[in-house]
Every structure is written in structure tokens, then in C-alpha cells.
Amino acid sequence: MAGSALPLPPPPPLSLQSPSQNQTRHSSTFSPPTLTPQTPSIRSRLSKICQDGNPQLARQLFDAIPKPTTVLWNTIIIGFICNNLPHEALLFYSRMKKTAPFTNCDAYTYSSTLKACAETKNLKAGKAVHCHLIRCLQNSSRVVHNSLMNMYVSCLNAPDCFEYDVVRKVFDNMRRKNVVAWNTLISWYVKTGRNAEACRQFGIMMRMEVKPSPVSFVNVFPAVSISRSIKKANVFYGLMLKLGDEYVKDLFVVSSAISMYAELGDIESSRRVFDSCVERNIEVWNTMIGVYVQNDCLVESIELFLEAIGSKEIVSDEVTYLLAASAVSALQQVELGRQFHGFVSKNFRELPIVIVNSLMVMYSRCGSVHKSFGVFLSMRERDVVSWNTMISAFVQNGLDDEGLMLVYEMQKQGFKIDYITVTALLSAASNLRNKEIGKQTHAFLIRQGIQFEGMNSYLIDMYSKSGLIRISQKLFEGSGYAERDQATWNSMISGYTQNGHTEKTFLVFRKMLEQNIRPNAVTVASILPACSQIGSVDLGKQLHGFSIRQYLDQNVFVASALVDMYSKAGAIKYAEDMFSQTKERNSVTYTTMILGYGQHGMGERAISLFLSMQESGIKPDAITFVAVLSACSYSGLIDEGLKIFEEMREVYNIQPSSEHYCCITDMLGRVGRVNEAYEFVKGLGEEGNIAELWGSLLGSCKLHGELELAETVSERLAKFDKGKNFSGYEVLLSNMYAEEQKWKSVDKVRRGMREKGLKKEVGRSGIEIAGYVNCFVSRDQEHPHSSEIYDVIDGLAKDMRGDSFLTTLPTVTPSLELDE
């Protein structure tokens, strides 16, 4: 058994020449003599050839030896490892076991082979070597034990819980443990998430009078950062300072200490460590810049970046520029982005692809997707990341059609779609509510057998937004409890809310809690709109309390959702209180509050908050302008609204969308300036060919009794009716005819709707009782007590038809009610 070969997989193809080719090439300098293991210079020659980076020549020399000794086997194995060919090193070990069973392996053989196993992460081979050394090597040295520990640490993953103790067992079997063994053990505990134990073992090492090395601190600092104790961090860092310059000047230790304090949220201490470092390399600079970026100290990160590139002592690398690009992206300032782009271009003869990709991301996040596309088009060479970056930029900026076209072009250019491309495709399908593209993408995933983390949540979200909630439900139920992660639960909750199934929203939320899946900010932000839909402030308050207990109420998305919920539920005072208590505000928070003011007819407050938002340095986006224009419309602030509309185009360079045009049309129509609204829409030309825009105009005609204009608008709307359900507009026109008692016209409209197969959308009502939501649809029979409910309704209807009740009713004009 001891002499059996390793169970090795086939090696990857060598990027080396065949022996015959090499023999020809080196014929002038090398002709293998007849060698024996006793040739004095053979080991040194073999070692020298490997050191010179010519492992193929070393192999030819080794193959010429009839019976290599253990020392020569060790030399060739180590030589191939040093030349980054660990797979081939393992093959030499296997060959040694097969062809030279009587050649004894020593400590160097095993330690070298175990190193090759660690580098290839070949656990099966590593275990085989472990068995070999147990059978063949009676007294393993510390070098072998250290290599064995390192192999297991490298090959085992954190989830391999059944082999948690194997590293510890090897460690405990060592008679004399040096600092290398302790370091490996500490790193293993950190890797497997046992950070407290890692810190404890460091303390035991100190008590055993084993002096820690710089690597000891590099390994233990990440464990200290997880402890959330700055006091403990100060103790470990203070110990490192006491040990002297060898540790203080070690730049890996410095970088690790900077990261440790940053993870604890103590940025000032990170900066103190950085400033105390006299000789810094680029890794130390990058670590400190990265700390600033990750903690949103964006101005400081850019200042430090400028200081780094201005230093004559160091040369900035790609990571430095990537970190700076991330900072500029987060600041979302296009002008700063342009300056950074120009600066980077001056510092590189030819920009590396990775930096060009980061420039595309930067422009995209600054809201200048056309600049991103310009960078993309200027690239001489693109990789799959370049294509995915540009596709994602289009989708994230609302240019979903352009993103889809680029996917098609990407395939034409010979690039394969990966999971990142698929996520962009699914997002585009969700945004466009395009179920066909979504289904095709889903089918592609199934055909290609592609699986990636979060795939189910993307699919559920896509089908939900496309109105195919039943398919979403099937995917959710088919996944099983074990496979459902937090994102999957959130997608299903959000899907039910978006499709108006509020009772199922709360049902899934309860099941989520029962399965001990901890809700996060996305969960709460997804479920709060359901409270708005049923108008339940009490249920909203319960969720507000839940978010406070879970420390989620100050999350910017949860805070915005709470403001929105209270506003839509009619509790505008609660919405104001929530807004004022929110410490961190972004454009979403402001937009939600502005929208709330608008819905409650508080247009002046909405405009005041809009101005306050601008003064605070938060740039309003397209949605913010929709909110403030809506507020002006609801409050009749026409002049103010038109002024803001012009400001949007000229100052913020935001191109109006159909929603902005609808706001202006509605704004003019509400105050009776219907003809002016009509001229505005007509003047838009091709941009005005939007059903919602003309539908808004039709609503204004209904409000002010402009029947003649309504007929003109209806004719225009009919041109948009390409198999879509525009029953709402038809009903509106029919009701106008009914008010004018033009019954023939009413009948004509109804007949036309029936011929088209149009139906009035069914009304849906909900009521929350004792924490449970009961939903009702017109003529619904699904409720278990529907017969009793309809009996009560019939009784109420009879009472309402009584003489005493009818005398209190005003005279009304009949309106169109279609059969459901």
C-alpha cells in the first residue's frame, strides 16, 4: 500500500515543448551524457536548471538518470513547484512511488508533495500522501507536520464541518510546536469562522513562550475585527508595538492593522496606523484608500489618492486607480468623472481593460450612460466584463432596449453569455414587463444548465413584474424551504405586493418568520406598501415597531418605505415625523416625502422640501421631478410647476419622460386649461405618441365637460389600441356621453368594447381584522363565507332601496357599468 501511486486526475496540458523539440533547440548547448546517481554535479546542475526557469530541460536531464536517488527526486519535485507547475510535481511523486518502490521518501519528499497538494487544492492526493507518511515515516519532523497542516487548511473549506478537527489533530500530534504551526492553526480558526478561538489560541501561544511572528498578527487581526471590541484591538496592536521594529515596519502587518480598525468602524485609528508607518509601499496606500471608500469617506479617499500618485517613493498600480474610480462613482459627479478620466489617460500609454471597465461603471453611476457607451466604443480590445458592464449600465439607467440589443451584439462577436449577462437580461425583462424575453432567458438557463446564487429570486422578481404571479409562486413553492434564501423570500413578498395580493404578502411574511429566516431591510421595505394598499395604519405601525426592534428603522430604504406607507395611508403627520427622525437621507427619502405632500394637496410644502433637498447637496433625479410636478398639479401651482419643468431640462439636463409630460398635461387640465394641455401634447410630435398622455388629457376633458375635444382625443387613443386593454378610456368616454344623455353614443361605445373583447377591470377591496387581511373582488365566490356575505349585502341593498333612504340621495346621472 505504501508504494501505491497517487489517485491523481489527468494533468492540464503543459505549455512546454515536447522533448524532441527541445532536444533540437538545445542541441548546441546540451547533449545528455550517460549519467548515474553518483555523478557529483548532477544535483546542483538539476537545481540550477530549475532555478533558471527551464523545467522541461530539467526533466530531460532527470529522465536520463537510470536510478535517481531520493535527493534527486526531491530536487525535481521542488523544482517544478518553484516553476508554478504543482500538477507536474505531483506526477513526479506518483511516478516515484510506481517506478522506484524501494526508494525511500524522506521529510523533504513529503513536505514538498504536500505543498503541491495545497497549491492545487487536491485534497484526495493530500490525504493519500498523509497515509503514505503514516506508514513509511516513523518520526515526522516539524516541517512535515507544518506542511500537512497547511495542506488541510488550503484544501478544506469552511462548510467541511466533518473535518473541522483534522487540522487540530495534526497540531496536537506535534511534539514540539513552532510559531509556523501556531500561525497555521490560528489561520484555520479564522477561515472557519471561529474567531474567538483564534484569539484564544494566540493567547495560549504567548503563554507557551512561543514568540509570535509578523504573520501571527496578520492572521489574528481579522479575528479581532470580528469581535467588535476596539479595546481588544488596542491590546493586540499594543502588543505588536512592544515587540519592536521588526513588526512595526512589516508592511503586511501595517495593512492588516489598518483593515482591523476599519472593520471596527474606527477610521481615525486606521489613519493613525497609516500615518505612523514611515516606509509605505503601494499596498499600504491602497489599503487606506480602500478603507475610506468602503466607509463613504469619499473626499478623503480622493485626497489620499492624489497624495499617493504625487509621491516619488511609490508607483501606483491598477488597484489604486480602481479605488479612486469607485470613489468618483459614489460621488456621482460627472464633471469630476471627466477630470479623473483625463488624468488616468495621461498616466497610461494604453489604458488597461480593467481600468476602462471601471470608467464605464463610473460614468454610469454618475448618470451619464452615453459617456459610458462612448468609452465602450473607444475600446480597441474588450473582454466579457466590458460587455457585461455596458449591458448592466444600460439596464440600470432605464435603457433596457439598448441593453438587450447589446446582448445580441455580444453574441455576434463570439462572447458567451454568463450569469452576469443573464441577471442583466432578467432585470431588463422585469423593467420592460416583457414576459417573452423573461421566458426565453429562463429557458436558456435551463438548456445551458446554468445555476448561480440568487437565480430564483431574479426569476421570481421578473415573472412578478410581468404579471405572471402564478409562475413566480410555482418557482417559489418548487424551491423547497432548504433552498430558499433571504432574497428568494423577499422577491416573493415583493411580487405579491406589486400584484395586489396583500393577504398572500402577509402570509408569506409569517411563514418566513416561522422558518427562522431573519427579515432584512429589503423585506420590510417590500411589505410596507401592502399596508398602504389596504389603508391599515395600525398594521403599518406594527411593522414600524418591528423594524425598530430589528434596528432597521434608520436604514434609508426602510425609512423611505415608512414615509411612503404613512403618506398613502392618510397619516401625513406620522410621515413627517418619520422623515424628520431619519438621520441618513437620499434622493429616495426626499422624493417620497415630496410625493406624500403632493398627494395631500400640500404643494407649497412639497416645493419647499424640494428646495431644501437642493440646498443639502442631494441631486434630484427624474423621479424627484415627477413627484414635485405631481404636487404642483394636485395643488394647482401651475406657474411654479412649469418653472420647475424648465429647470429640470436646462439646469439638470434631464430629458423629460412620458411621466413628466403627463404631469404637465394633468397640471394644465386640472385648472381648466384643457385646450392649452391639448396643444402641449400635440406639440410634442412623436414624443407625444403615448397612450397615458392622451388618457390624462381625456380625464381632463371629462372633468371640465369638454365632450367635443374628448371625442378628438378618443380617436387618437384608438390608434394606440393594438390589442391592449384600454377599457378605462372607453368607459370614461361612455360616461361623458351618459352625462350628456347621448344614449346612442353610449350604446355604440359599449358595443365596440364588446366586439374588442374589452372588460372593465374588476374592483378589489381589502379589510384587515385582527392582523389578517381579507380581500374581496366583485362577484367573488372564493371566500369560505361568501354566501353569508352576499346575504348581508342583499339585505343592506334592500334597506337602501327603502323610501326613507332614497329621499336622502341626490339625483345622479347613470354611467356605464360593463358585465364583469
Curated annotation (Swiss-Prot):
Residues 22-42 have a biased composition (Polar residues). One of its GO terms (molecular function) is mRNA binding. It is found in: Plastid, Chloroplast. It comes from the Eukaryota. Belongs to the PPR family. PCMP-E subfamily. PANTHER family: PENTATRICOPEPTIDE REPEAT-CONTAINING PROTEIN. This is Pentatricopeptide repeat-containing protein At3g22150, chloroplastic. It comes from Arabidopsis thaliana. The lineage of its organism: Eukaryota, Viridiplantae, Streptophyta, Embryophyta, Tracheophyta. The gene is PCMP-E95.
